Amino acid sequence: MTPIQKTATVGGKEVLLETGKVAKQAHGSVWVRLGDSIVLVTAVSAAEKKEGIDFFPLTVDYQEKLFAAGRVPGSFFRREGRPTEKETLTSRLVDRSCRPLFAEGYSNETQVIATVISFDQENDTDVLALTGASAALHISDIPFGGPIAGVRVARVGGQLVANPTLAQRADADLDVVMAASRDAIVMVEGGAQEVSEAVMIEALLFGQAAVQPLLDAQDALRAATGNKPRRAFDPPKNDVELRAKVKALTWEKVKEAYGRDEKHDRYGRLSEIKKELLQALKEEAAGDAAKLATIALREKEIKGYYEDVKYDYMRKMITDERRRIGGRGMADIRKITCEVGLLPRVHGSSLFTRGETQALVATTLGTAEDEQRVEMLTGMVFKKFMLHYNFPPFSVGEVKFLRSPGRREIGHGALAERALRAVMPPEDQFPYTVRVVSDIMESNGSSSMASVCGGCLSLMDAGVPIKAPVAGIAMGLIKEGEKIAILSDILGDEDHLGDMDFKVCGTAAGITSIQMDIKIGGVTREILEQALSQAAEGRKHILGEMAKALSAPRGSISAYAPRITTIKIRPERIKDIIGPGGKTIKDITARTGTSINIEDDGSVSIASPNQDKVEEAIKMIRGLTQEAEVGRIYMGTVRKIAEFGAFVEIFPGTDGLIHISELSDKRVKSVSDVLSEGEEVMVKVISVDRSGKIRLSRKEALADSAKKSEGTEPPKGEPAK
């Protein structure tokens, strides 16, 4: 196959799509290039459907090869290891964007692999993977309803930029990744520095317009590869008569069940209705072996029709009756309770409860040694703020093995972390490494938003001087023709059966984090404006409830948290603190029980829960790094006697020479007539040459001391007064 190339211009830069050059045995293979960043994306789908499942078995893997940036992995085996957080989050971005677009009922295992094979340190590769995934699927025979395309939108200096460079992103106050089709925004993920709802909407619409050339390029690429027909598959069965019977047997019962407020009570009743449905159908067919056998064979189909009844009823209840599960109105938020400081030995803690969703959140303050070190294409990255989200099985009344965090947990944690990072104090004002852990105690929707609220309270309880409190809310959408309902603080059912999951986090002043997944086309600007406006009102209500527990950061950190003091020394004196083989710094930390971190610029951070120990360590460091000052008088110790003078240590590690002529104002025949080794002596620094050699004078020190009738002898190693 001859390689085929198509190009599109996005944000003034050319994006290249190429197929037919590599990975030709994949069902779809596209090479995406922006600048010198290149991502290879492949799509493959199994020939046969996977039996016994009720979901689409799609796997998306995004991987960054360190050779792409000319780097060798730092692991023991010098190979890439488990996926990084960036790889996991990008895999989720692609999955969330593409999954809703596959044909309903298609159940063949499908895998999309995006591999970064070149990185130019300017153009990020996540949006290339997103566009490449759509293109690879679009040119294949896999039943995919694309194309879509990905773009990053940033606001730099008040101007919106499509696919900004890494340098531009560093100066941006808004940074979102989004996927869009011809007529709809499909997915949004990003953060901001308290921007307004109007700015966010403009950014999203700007991004949707920016991807249109990429959609044209994908269509052109598909046409150039022969418009391969989509493969045939068995669509979902639709027995109109059986569907009507299922509805007749369950509609009123489902109506009663959805009137129950408590989640497990409601779920239990809905499960009972399903059993009653199957039993009723079997009783109706009693005595007819063929019909009974048919019911057994079609049980999965019958359950599917029952799920449709639940779907139809809940949506009708919302759009027609303007009533939600539990009787709430469209903008109503569940009851909120907040508690802080409930874990006595933890640096900061909170318990945030909203309806049947609850998060127990703890904050830990650490030192520079606790920073997370992450190897990325851009180099080694150090994270001083982390938020980890955990979703144990008991939170939803289930029994499962406890395993390491999955993609969902990592994604929810990243969303909450981004929401709070925007209000964290700068490092020079608060030099701590901060770890927030959110453990979900119970869940019925919006647990990630509970983590944001609980995380904020926990940070304030820990005394972290955040700029402003942050809250999060999950919004939903039900759209039936012209009937539209926008829901605040959605439940799990409303998320599952709705058309949009829109999470918005921020302060009273503006948005700090956003995540949106839309399952339908045609979400208009008006819908986005109403959703964001309703979210802002809900956010302010939640902030008010949080303020009842704690309205501002505590004035001091926990007694159990380390106290960190930072001092500055000359960089060339760093070696004096470290000592040969680290001997000196190890001695200081052992004697004081402190943790010491030294930066290349001479910043020295000393940490300990005991402030007295911090001061002790600072005194020792000052003693090692202080500089001799010309004209100052010191008490020193004679370390060596020579014919021409004496070497005196004026403070630890620093010696100077008293020439024999500077011992006394009288003639001295022998140095040993005046001084002896180990003797303490008052000396004055009379010069320091370019090489750092110090000249001392005993006679000038004595003369100066005699002139000061109120003078006192200075302590050893310190200037005289």
Curated annotation (Swiss-Prot):
GO cellular component term, pick one: cytosol
Span of domain S1 motif: 631-699
SMART domains linked: KH (SM00322), S1 (SM00316)
MF annotations from Gene Ontology: 3'-5'-RNA exonuclease activity; magnesium ion binding; polyribonucleotide nucleotidyltransferase activity; RNA binding
Region of interest called Disordered, as start-end residue ranges on this chain: 699-721
Superkingdom of origin organism: Bacteria
The protein's Enzyme Commission number: 2.7.7.8
Residue intervals of the KH domain: 562-621
Gene3D superfamilies membership: GHMP Kinase, N-terminal domain, K Homology domain, type 1, Nucleic acid-binding proteins
Main subcellular location of this protein, as a coarse class: cytoplasm
Keyword Membrane: no
A GO BP entry: mRNA catabolic process
UniProt-annotated location(s): Cytoplasm
Keywords, alphabetical: Cytoplasm, Magnesium, Metal-binding, Nucleotidyltransferase, RNA-binding, Transferase
Cofactors (names): Mg(2+)
Binding site for Mg(2+): D495, D501
HAMAP family: PNPase (MF_01595)
Described function: Involved in mRNA degradation. Catalyzes the phosphorolysis of single-stranded polyribonucleotides processively in the 3'- to 5'-direction.
UniProt similarity note: Belongs to the polyribonucleotide nucleotidyltransferase family.
Protein name in UniProt: Polyribonucleotide nucleotidyltransferase
Species for this entry: Anaeromyxobacter dehalogenans (strain 2CP-C)
Name of encoding gene: pnp
